[in-house]
């Protein structure tokens, strides 16, 4: 089992630079520390509230390939932290959260929440119209008292107000649909929403209803219809990512925590 603060993923050191601008949703111009200006792929196509700051430091991965249009990928962004006026690095690659949560489960870090898991299948078709894909479908071990399959939806969470993480940071009809789909699998299966908090300076999670009021309403409805919420926090560094533990959550920005 990986302990709090320990490394969950290692990788070659990222390059650092200054963000010049993001444009056309998928592209970002960045000046590297040696003065070279490169164009990087930006996997996060949302507004990136509180994270998209031209002039601030960012980290990139260099991975040239004939199959890629761009050699660089924007991975992390430095933002002001709420802990003692320090800085915090935020993970902005939206393809990482599913991998991080899968690593957590395989390392038995969520055994208390899920019990023993015999297998994990990603991107399984499910839902009311069989047109959605669940991020992770967990199959419990035969030793588990609860033999129901576990449907896990993962949401990359980078926006915050003080030490409160919020998702979403814009209106998301897709996210609303995912909550409805999770509600539809309960009680025959377990339904779990995991906000993957891609920064370490967070104490609580709440729905970002100031950006999407309907999502906030559906979030609270989902809680009454069996959907479990397990916010998981991670720390981002130049050559590794750490497991920072489970955070409590609130039904809204003002409500009591769980």
UniProtKB/Swiss-Prot annotation:
Source taxonomy: Bacteria, Bacillati, Cyanobacteriota, Cyanophyceae, Synechococcales
Family in the record: Belongs to the SfsA family.
GO molecular function (one): DNA binding
Pfam families membership: SfsA, SfsA_N
HAMAP family: SfsA
Identification of the protein by name: Sugar fermentation stimulation protein homolog
């Amino acid at each position: 089992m990986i302990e709090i603060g320990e490394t969950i993923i290692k990788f070659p050191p990222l390059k650092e630079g200054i963000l010049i601008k993001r444009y056309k949703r998928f592209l970002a111009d960045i000046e590297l520390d040696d003065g070279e200006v490169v164009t990087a792929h930006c996997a996060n196509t949302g507004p990136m509230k509180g994270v998209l700051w031209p002039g601030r430091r960012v980290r990139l991965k260099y991975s040239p390939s004939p199959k890629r249009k761009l050699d660089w990928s924007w991975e992390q962004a430095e933002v002001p932290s709420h802990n003692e006026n320090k800085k915090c690095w935020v993970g902005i690659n939206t393809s990482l959260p599913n991998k991080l949560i899968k690593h957590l489960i395989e390392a038995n870090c969520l055994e208390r929440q899920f019990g023993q898991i015999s297998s994990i299948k990603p991107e399984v078709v499910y839902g009311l119209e069989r047109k959605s894909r669940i991020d992770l479908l967990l199959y419990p071990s035969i030793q588990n008292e609860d033999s129901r399959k576990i449907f896990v939806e993962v949401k990359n969470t980078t926006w915050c107000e003080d030490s409160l993480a919020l998702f979403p940071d814009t209106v998301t009809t897709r996210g609303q649909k995912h909550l409805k789909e999770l509600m539809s699998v309960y009680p025959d299966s377990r339904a779990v929403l995991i906000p993957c908090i891609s920064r370490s300076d967070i104490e609580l999670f709440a729905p970002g209803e100031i950006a999407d009021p309907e999502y906030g309403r559906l979030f609270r409805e989902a809680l009454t219809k069996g959907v479990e919420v397990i916010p998981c926090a991670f720390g981002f560094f130049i050559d590794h990512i750490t497991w920072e533990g489970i955070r409590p959550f609130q039904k809204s920005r003002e409500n009591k925590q769980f």
